[in-house]
Amino acid sequence: MYRIRVFGDPVLRKRAKPVTKFDENLKKTIERMIETMYHYDGVGLAAPQVGISQRFFVMDVGNGPVAVINPEILEIDPETEVAEEGCLSFPEIFVEIERSKRIKVKYQNTRGEYVEEELEGYAARVFQHEFDHLNGVLIIDRISPAKRLLLRKKLMDIARTVKR
């Protein structure tokens, strides 16, 4: 199992690098990430959240775990909805975030094969949230400065726990 990196850890702000090796090492890392995600009752976990600055994440929105490697968002529906989101890198913080209701995506599986699919609702939301992590974008970047100010003390408390 991995230790979750929390707000204040520099790896969360980096743009992750593409995966180039689809080997047993990657599969083992993904298995460990899935185990970690379930242990913390998450529905998604991006590689940067466990200290790996590479472009992949795992998610499970009810149909079993999926590994998403080198993802792209091909189309974003202009229709959006606002819903509450949490994040394992922000313990006990939940914020309302506006995201597209439907997206068309492309990614690679653990064998390096390309997968293209359309996601909507909760699956689209989780994909967008995890995709943000690969670009160094965090949930607090998606809220207003006023709301971020209200969370300032909690954020500072979380950042103090980061091992430097």
Swiss-Prot record:
Active site: 130
Reaction(s) catalysed (UniProt annotation): N-terminal N-formyl-L-methionyl-[peptide] + H2O = N-terminal L-methionyl-[peptide] + formate
Family: Belongs to the polypeptide deformylase family.
Keywords of this entry: Hydrolase, Iron, Metal-binding, Protein biosynthesis
One GO biological process term: translation
Gene3D superfamilies linked to this entry: Peptide deformylase (3.90.45.10)
One annotated GO molecular function: peptide deformylase activity
Protein name: Peptide deformylase
Keyword Lipoprotein (UniProt): no
Known function: Removes the formyl group from the N-terminal Met of newly synthesized proteins. Requires at least a dipeptide for an efficient rate of reaction. N-terminal L-methionine is a prerequisite for activity but the enzyme has broad specificity at other positions.
Co-factor binding details: Binds 1 Fe(2+) ion.
Highest taxon listed in the record's lineage: Bacteria
Main enzyme class: hydrolase
List of residues binding Fe cation: 87, 129, 133
